[in-house]
Amino acid sequence: MKVVRKSMSGGFFNRIGRKLFGRRDVLTSANMKSSYQKCYDSILIIHHRVMVSTGEERERGLEDSVLNSAAIQGFCDVLEYYPNSISKAALAIDYIANFHPFVEGNKRTAFEVAVALLRKGGLELNDDDETFNFIKDVAWGKYDREDIEVWLRCNTHLSNL
């Protein structure tokens, strides 16, 4: 990964920080924006596929189906800090099912994003019917992120692929 030095500039705190502590430099990843954009775009594509596959795609375009883009942005901002595919999938289920970034299809999109994250980590879910009921319960607020992670650990197995 290429690392570049970037001077922190702008903003009230940064001006105060420079006055008190001198010039401050921060190491940033050169490909950070592309990673974030890839996450955001992937979620939009998954959502679009979910809506098309269930016959619910309306005349709206891909961007028009987003109700709360800040929820997707928040998810993509914190995703990289989670250590493994199970905790990332738990975050996806909790975040997308509860923050409702889309007009329709939030639970289905949460499920598909979680499946994609698990597959990326070499894991598969055991039973889709049980998973569907679990996702509904999550959306009703019956489980928090830690409960979701425990459930995923008990209901996944190594992929044969």
PLM-predicted stretches and their roles:
Residues 1-161:
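FIC/Doc superfamily catalytic core
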